[in-house]
């Protein structure tokens, strides 16, 4: 059940318009720069900024000393200029004095080494000590700014899970054991789910449950254990977000809460279908990848965001005006792409266009990351594009674009965070399997065909669509397989991609032939029975790099040996693959 949709108002006469701005870090600059910042914001049409995302150390420079003076001044300066503030909980990074006093709040990597402080999210989400300090900060912020008219929304944390998604500390171990006990009830149920009779790993009690730390270069983690650790990491960070949100809501219940998801090219790390239920409006950080498919990937990510927002407006909390700085090679955007990408987000349902960050940093890890105001200042082609974009967004807002909804397609591509996690397993036939990338490829194929598909979480209700597509949905439960069967029986079309329905929710193989999901129900629906699959590619010694079908289509990764039930399945294309032995697959 989603929370009631609540959108942050702007400081305009009617509180409406398309929100435009970005992360603003005034504490990186001397106060004599602030007036110039506000002047340039007004010139560019900026009407909202996110403040204090990484400012805990400035707000609480020592354990028993608080300094809100600078934050008071900048919020007041912004608000009087008509610029709304999306105020952060400031917990994205903690002050160094906290780590010095309580080193036990640090997370650990899979080798058991503490993750040193000095970057962001260097804290364990399961640390009770860290949570106590973080919630104290949240309450202090709510008490001071909860009734401030210039603060129109709360920005909780920042990109939860980007740095501390996988924590192997003792805090995490203890929390994981409790999580497993709540999920399974008895150790017998856990042993069955994880298949611990393989390699002799049966446990006598939850006190013997381990997290999947490094076990040696040639060892593989139990895939069921690893999958549950993925779920656990998602749940622990979501619990931490909710604790922060609720601490502020107890004092300031009237303003909307959000946190920025990460859905883009290779960033879809959490089960955002769960997270979307806990925010008042959905927000996303989207960063482009170079190449001709960039705009298709943008539309694909936005299609998922639209579904997560249940068709309501959503927020682009971050994207880039030009180059980022965290890739091996960081290409700039070409002329017009900053405006094009932003308007594309609006066309896909976004009512807020924000960037990281307002002014390009002069120092630090992201100093070469592009911004609204570049290092060269206002007399630049980039800042002129920023002003052009601000004017375009105002025109769209004045025309009433805000609040409009996308028309639903008749086709849904189903996305499963758990299948995405499963395709990262080291125990699969190919490490090239990637559910999210296949979702993107299917989405692009629909665009190339002149139509558009929606992207809908598998766990949502998709029964109103005419067609559903499952691209590499490797994990299907019996319940979801039955939903597909009911959908097909009611006249819906089900398109099954390769490597779909091979395992259940515990990472157990569905037996009897592929795809065996639902104890063979999926296999019966399709009228086929796969005996064996084969991995293609140059890396697979002795195997072809591709197979060409009689229809002209080409496959380059996965080949199935399939038996067909002639009464229930019609063959549309065939192939012949000969080996040096007497065996042949056709």
Language-model features, listed with the residues they occupy:
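Polysaccharide-binding and catalytic clefts of secreted carbohydrate-active enzymes
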Residues: 111-281, 285-288, 292-298
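Short, well-ordered coil/turn segments that N-cap beta-strands
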Residues: 16-18, 45-47, 81-85, 147-152, ...
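Short, acidic/polar
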Residues: 29-41, 264-273, 334-342
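Carbohydrate-binding surfaces of carbohydrate-active enzymes
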Residues: 284-581, 586
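The substrate-binding groove and active-site-proximal loops of carbohydrate-active enzymes
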Residues: 20-29, 55-69, 116-133, 163-164, ...
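Conserved, mostly hydrophobic/aromatic
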Residues: 22, 41, 49, 78, ...
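Aromatic-lined substrate-binding rim segments of carbohydrate-active enzymes
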Residues: 36-39, 51-111, 244-251
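N-terminal carbohydrate-binding accessory modules
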Residues: 1-48, 402
């Amino acid at each position: 059940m989603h929370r009631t949709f609540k959108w942050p108002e702007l400081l305009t006469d009617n509180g409406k318009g398309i929100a435009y701005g970005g992360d603003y870090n005034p504490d990186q600059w001397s106060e004599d720069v602030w007036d110039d910042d506000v002047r340039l914001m007004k010139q560019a049409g900026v009407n909202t900024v996110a403040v204090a995302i990484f400012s805990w150390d400035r707000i609480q420079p020592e354990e028993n000393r608080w300094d809100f003076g600078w934050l008071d001044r900048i919020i007041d300066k912004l608000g009087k200029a008509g610029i709304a503030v999306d105020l952060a909980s400031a917990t994205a990074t903690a002050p160094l004095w906290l780590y010095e006093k309580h080193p036990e709040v640090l997370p650990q990597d899979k080798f058991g080494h503490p993750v040193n402080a000095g970057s962001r999210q260097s804290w364990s989400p399961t640390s009770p000590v860290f949570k106590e300090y973080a919630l104290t900060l949240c309450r202090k912020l709510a008490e001071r700014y909860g009734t401030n008219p210039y603060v129109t929304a709360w920005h909780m944390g920042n990109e939860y899970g980007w740095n501390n998604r996988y924590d192997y500390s003792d805090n995490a171990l203890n929390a994981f054991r409790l999580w497993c006990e709540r999920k399974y009830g008895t150790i017998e149920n856990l042993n069955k789910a994880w298949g611990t009779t393989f390699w002799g790993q049966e446990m006598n009690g939850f006190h013997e449950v381990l997290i999947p730390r490094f076990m040696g270069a040639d060892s593989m983690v139990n895939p069921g254990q690893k999958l549950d650790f993925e779920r656990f990491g998602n749940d622990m960070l979501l619990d931490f977000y909710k604790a922060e949100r609720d601490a502020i809501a107890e004092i300031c219940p009237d303003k909307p809460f959000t946190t920025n998801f990460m859905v883009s090219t290779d960033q879809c790390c959490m089960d955002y279908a769960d997270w979307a239920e806990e925010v008042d409006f959905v927000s996303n950080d989207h960063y482009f990848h170079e190449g001709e498919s960039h705009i298709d990937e943008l539309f694909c990510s936005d299609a998922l965001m639209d579904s997560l927002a249940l068709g309501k407006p959503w927020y682009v909390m971050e994207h880039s005006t030009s180059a980022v700085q965290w890739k091996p090679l960081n290409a700039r955007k070409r002329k017009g792409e900053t405006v094009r990408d932003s308007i594309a987000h609006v066309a896909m349902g976004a009512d807020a266009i924000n960037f990281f960050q307002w002014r390009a940093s002069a120092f630090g890890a992201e100093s070469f990351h592009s911004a609204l105001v570049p290092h060269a200042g206002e007399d630049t082609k980039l800042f002129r594009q920023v002003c052009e974009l601000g004017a375009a967004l105002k025109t769209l807002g004045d025309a009433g674009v805000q609040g409009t909804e996308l028309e639903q397609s008749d086709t849904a591509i189903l996305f499963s965070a758990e299948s995405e996690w499963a395709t990262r397993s080291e125990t699969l036939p190919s490490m090239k399997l990637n559910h999210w990338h296949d979702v993107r490829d299917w989405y692009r194929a629909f665009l190339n065909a002149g139509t558009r598909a929606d992207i809908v979480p598998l766990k949502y209700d998709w029964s109103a669509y005419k067609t559903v597509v499952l691209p590499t949905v490797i994990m299907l439960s019996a319940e979801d397989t039955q939903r597909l069967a009911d959908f097909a029986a009611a006249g819906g079309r089900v398109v099954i991609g390769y490597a779909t329905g091979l395992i259940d929710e515990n990472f157990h193989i569905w037996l009897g032939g592929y795809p065996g999901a639902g104890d063979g129900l999926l296999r019966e629906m399709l009228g086929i029975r796969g005996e064996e699959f084969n991995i293609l590619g140059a890396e697979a010694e002795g195997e072809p790099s591709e197979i060409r079908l009689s229809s002209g289509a080409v496959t380059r990764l996965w080949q199935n040996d399939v038996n067909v039930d002639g009464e229930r399945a019609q063959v549309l294309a065939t192939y012949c693959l000969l080996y040096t032995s007497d065996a042949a697959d056709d």
